[in-house]
Amino acid sequence: MKNKHFDSSPQTEYGYINSNQFSANPLPNNRFWVAENFYNNPEEVRDFALMQWYHDDPGYLGLRTRKQFFFEGVKEKIEGIMNKTITKWEDYEMNGRFQSSKAGIKPVYHCDSQQYAAAVYLTPNAP
């Protein structure tokens, strides 16, 4: 295909250029998603999370709930965001847990065996 190129103002450094030199991939391999306002009521979710029982485990930093919380519609919402089907929703032991970390604790960046991971931040006015 022959490249088409139009410069609205070729004599200056301003203006715009229309071109077919590059195009977007029609089927990108998305590996990262951001969803704002995930919960309808994040303050209530946070209050609920703060009332749960957390335990300390030497295997990771911070505190986590022992219980897993699978709230109605969350799996489907994540599937919609990713445009993928989640097949082992309840099988992975870290799924649906609340975690709490204190300010100043440096996170440990790592990779587990699952294909995807998600985090919902509930700290109000976080930096």
Task: List where the protein language model places each region.
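Fe(II)/2-oxoglutarate oxygenase catalytic core
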Residues: M1-P127
